[in-house]
Swiss-Prot record:
PANTHER family: TUBULIN. Keywords: Cytoplasm, Cytoskeleton, GTP-binding, Magnesium, Metal-binding, Microtubule, Nucleotide-binding. Its main location: cytoplasm. This is Tubulin beta-1 chain. It is found in: Cytoplasm, Cytoskeleton.
Length: 445
């Protein structure tokens, strides 16, 4: 089977990751201890993608949990999934990274990384045919961003031909907890452009908005936000976990969604998102409408400001694929300005008959939209405001970093923004398009 090893780093990464395992272990009919109690063959058919069978029918997640302080692991151990993870797979330091990317990437994190790689190697050896890795982390703190990107680089070095997917929580303007977020995020994006194959971008601001506006929760907690993210992650990985045709592994997903290697940052959305009483049965039309509604997208950049290069949708439950195709076509015709015309058939639809827990039908949306440059631009602007004054820089140079790295990261992110802009402007037969076609291969290197 095509296995995926899951890594979760830092406080945010571990909480999001644990919420993901909480969601999928239920979908596959496993109880809190990992014993299979499902009734449906589809639940067990591809269990081994994310789980490895330990003793007597007990399944254990292929997960490696990493943090630079013990508190997160203690919380997981005492939580409902405490006995679910393999204890040897929890690797943690004592000192924390103090929201400092350099600590996570160069000092504290670098000391711990070999221990983590040993666990990753052991997990990889237990796989028949490893397809790749997925990592959950945030880009605003120290461990998830600094050590997370270090881990991605090291794993990449050791498994160069395997896929690397990341679920990255971007810092957002309204919900800011750390003053150096723009530094940490820019340094991380600099790494992700080079070392990740697909990055699903999520930000807290959009999650808060969804909780408040759509789910009518007055004071959403991180638990609510993580639940939302886990719903989306469960939807995104449906194709890998259940028998299906489209996007059945990480590589096929990337082939369908990444037109140019650097442009692999996706926005994600989920439907139905309604306050619980009213979602009993939504039709295909409402699902599709909701899924393509910017309010349901988990990133605070409105995709109507840009154009979709590619899209992929996953419907779950009892739905008629004919209706789905018609709805998607209708959306594409109605909003044709939001899709680039030089990639024909750029919306893919997939279907899986197993619905998520508690819902009859659901749909998940992945879009590669040029509007994501707005999120990068926002981080970049904050970065330059601070970097021009060299504010807080001593925290980073004190850990052995050089200012040059900041300059490089900034210009790499600016390049990324202008690449997205360039493909947004490129038309079918304007001169731009032809110029880009000549240039594109050189740029991809």
């Amino acid at each position: 089977m095509r296995e995926i090893i899951h890594l979760q780093t830092g406080q945010c990464g571990n909480q999001v990751g644990t919420a993901f395992w909480q969601t999928i272990h239920g979908e596959h009919g496993l109880d809190q201890d990992g014993v299979f109690r499902g009734s449906d063959e589809q639940q067990s058919e591809r269990l081994s993608v994310y789980f490895t069978e330990a003793a007597k029918q007990k399944y254990v997640p292929r997960a490696v949990l990493v943090d630079l302080e013990p508190a997160t692991m203690d919380a997981i151990r005492s939580g409902p999934l405490g006995d679910f993870f393999r204890p040897d797979n929890m690797v943690y330091g004592q000192s924390g990274a103090g929201n400092n990317w350099a600590k996570g990437h160069y000092t504290e994190g670098a000391e711990l990384v070999d221990q983590v790689l040993d666990v990753v190697r052991r997990e990889a050896e237990a796989c028949d045919s490893l397809q790749g890795f997925q990592i959950t982390h945030s880009l605003g703190g120290g461990t998830g961003s600094g050590m997370g990107t270090l881990l991605i680089a090291k794993v990449r070095e050791e498994f160069p031909d395997r896929m690397m997917a990341t679920f990255s929580v971007l810092p957002s303007a309204k919900v800011s907890e750390v003053v150096v977020e723009p530094y940490n995020a820019t340094l991380s994006i600099h790494q992700l452009v080079e070392n990740s194959d697909e990055t699903f971008c999520i930000d807290n601001e959009a999650l808060y908005d969804i909780c408040r506006r759509t789910l009518k929760q007055a004071h959403p907690s991180y638990g609510h936000l993580n639940h939302l993210v886990s719903r989306v992650m469960s939807g995104l990985t449906t194709g890998f976990r259940f028998p299906g045709q489209l996007n059945a592994d990480l590589r096929k997903l990337a082939v369908n969604l990444v037109p140019f290697p650097r442009l692999h940052f996706f926005t994600v959305g989920f439907a139905p998102l309604t306050s619980s009483a009213s979602f009993s049965n939504l039709g295909i039309a409402e699902l599709t409408q909701q899924m393509f509604d910017p309010k349901n997208v988990m990133l605070a950049s409105d995709f109507r400001d840009g154009r979709f290069l590619t899209c992929s949708t996953m419907f779950r439950g009892k739905v008629s694929m004919k209706q789905v195709e018609e709805q998607i076509q209708a959306i594409k015709n109605k909003n044709s300005a939001n899709f680039v015309e030089w990639i024909p058939n750029n919306i893919q639809t997939a279907h899986c008959s197993v619905p998520p827990k508690g819902l009859d039908v659901s749909s998940t949306f992945i879009g590669n939209s040029t509007a994501i440059q707005n999120s990068f631009r926002r981080v970049g602007d904050q970065f330059s405001l601070m970097f021009r004054r060299k504010a807080f820089l001593h925290w980073y140079t004190g850990e052995g970093m050089d200012e040059m790295e900041f300059t490089e990261a900034e210009s790499n992110m600016n390049d990324l923004v202008s690449e997205y802009q360039q493909y947004q402007d490129a038309g079918m037969d304007d001169e731009y398009g032809e110029e880009y076609e000549d240039e594109a291969p050189a740029e991809e290197e």
